[in-house]
Regions:
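Amphipathic, low-complexity, repeat-rich surface-exposed segments
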Residues: 1-143
Length: 143
């Protein structure tokens, strides 16, 4: 083989080696990026789960407190109604209790709705961030 041919083979080999090393580095970086990305996804799911757990805990406490108050209000109303002296007084007290119970129920439903709406917003925020990150990652690899 001539010196020129040997030199060409050496240059080709060096270029192939360089290209292969760059490819391996890019692949390793890609694997590292995917691993990191997946870890961040797991953390986002865990964060969302914690938010929902706290919201469920808050809602449960609210429901228990409401149930206790409703029971106490019902017992007080029953006691008050049992001491009425006339049919009209009975209907007045019964109507007042029903109105109060309904207003309390609507208020409680609003509180629970607020708890769950805030939880949904807060819990989905990390997932939305991960979706944005995934979109950005795909755009970066396409570029």
């Amino acid at each position: 083989m001539t010196k020129a041919a040997t030199k060409q083979v050496e240059e080709f080999t060096a270029e192939a080696k360089k290209t292969m090393e760059e490819g391996v580095e890019k692949m390793a970086k890609g694997v590292e990026d995917v691993t990191s990305f997946n870890q961040e996804n797991v953390e986002a799911v865990m964060t969302s789960g914690k938010v929902f757990a706290k919201a469920t805990e808050a809602a449960s406490a609210e429901i228990i407190a409401f149930s206790k108050k409703s029971y106490e209000d019902g017992m007080a109303a029953a006691k008050e109604i049992s001491s009425v002296k006339s049919v009209s007084e009975f209907f007045e007290k019964q109507t007042a209790f029903a109105k109060s119970a309904f207003e309390n129920y609507v208020s409680e439903a609003t509180k629970l709705n607020d708890i769950y709406a805030a939880a949904a917003k807060d819990a989905f925020a990390p997932m939305n961030d991960r979706f944005t990150a995934a979109t950005d990652m795909v755009k970066a690899y396409k570029a």
